[in-house]
Amino acid sequence: MELLKLNRSVQGPGPGSGSSLCRPGVSLLNSSSAGNLSCDPPRIRGTGTRELEMAIRITLYAVIFLMSVGGNVLIIVVLGLSRRLRTVTNAFLLSLAVSDLLLAVACMPFTLLPNLMGTFIFGTVICKAISYLMGVSVSVSTLNLVAIALERYSAICRPLQARVWQTRSHAARVILATWLLSGLLMVPYPVYTMVQPVGPRVLQCMHRWPSARVQQTWSVLLLLLLFFIPGVVIAVAYGLISRELYLGLHFDGENDSETQSRARNQGGLPGGAAPGPVHQNGGCRPVTSVAGEDSDGCCVQLPRSRLEMTTLTTPTPGPVPGPRPNQAKLLAKKRVVRMLLVIVLLFFLCWLPVYSVNTWRAFDGPGAQRALSGAPISFIHLLSYVSACVNPLVYCFMHRRFRQACLDTCARCCPRPPRARPQPLPDEDPPTPSIASLSRLSYTTISTLGPG
């Protein structure tokens, strides 16, 4: 098969193993940190098959590229302009959008064009830049997802400690640290990336590792640092968050039932107050709470003076109170956590095949090449780019405030012209004033004239 033939021609002499950046069959992170640019000579396959494959590939690349650029630019604009969305969590989502936009703009065109031209024409500088920027983008996205998970865990499960440091300035420092750490981690990519000839007038952007052992060590290191360890941290954090939210909703449900029963029988605390849990350092103990005082799923203890006033106050009969504001805030937090979980799952689903293929190729290159050449590796390649365009779709479908902010931003950028009031036709009678307008007119006339 042509992929295996080309892979053999790329290896070259010497102790180092070469990983091509110009091939759909080459690992994304071991090659360009993601980009294999197909440099197949047109004579390798039949003309009809190659043209059909290229048409499908161009269409998919174009759709993913437009969705990635348009969606992430929209996220950056909306989060930047909307004051209501300037929260700590959204600051990390903004950084995530920037990294996805970097992945789309800096890597996708330089992956597709060599596919069409059959050779890499952009030179060594662009070759090294593609490799480095894609690695940085993937690393930043992973670290941002870890930071979001830890921030949500602190806000929901450790609210008292989180209030000390959970600020936008602290989030900005964490985001800066993720970008710097990712930049340092991906330094080996530009060092071992180069453009080499693999045939007559055919160039490839590829990696030349010093030895096979170095390539294997690098693959395992990335698998641990950017996949397994972040995956475990995120899973544990969201597991604890889900447990805390479930306990908060469960306690609120019990308190609401007790409050309604007390209001029907002998009356109870006004405003839906009921014995509830207060979370301290992850634990819960029953105290009296007031609805809506805390938005992190943790009830706040009622001061003694208010308890005394509550005891002396006789409740007035009225309708059974509805859902408490505190429960509504817990439900809102649950929706946000659900959205973040979807983002994390989609990211790891898109990149799991890439990491698996990279590790497989590092330890068994010929076997991986035989099994994945052709359509499978092309699908894996495109799947990694899909991760850059799914987040805007998730926000639009699962984030009500983001949808409203998008509408507000569009209305601000494209204001509608004022509507002119329809004029009555010549043969139409003038509109008859309503009873309410007549009453206002009479009242205005009497008030203006004053007493007679």
From Swiss-Prot:
Regions of compositional bias (Polar residues) in chain numbering: 434-452
Region (Disordered) residue spans: 1-21, 257-286, 421-452
Recorded topology in the membrane: Multi-pass membrane protein
Gene, per the UniProt record: Cckbr
Residue numbers with lipid attached (S-palmitoyl cysteine): 413
PANTHER family named in the record: G-PROTEIN COUPLED RECEPTOR (PTHR24243), GASTRIN_CHOLECYSTOKININ TYPE B RECEPTOR (PTHR24243:SF45)
Disulfide-bonded cysteines: 127-205
Entry similarity comment: Belongs to the G-protein coupled receptor 1 family.
Protein name: Gastrin/cholecystokinin type B receptor
Positions in the Extracellular compartment: 1-57, 110-131, 190-219, 361-378
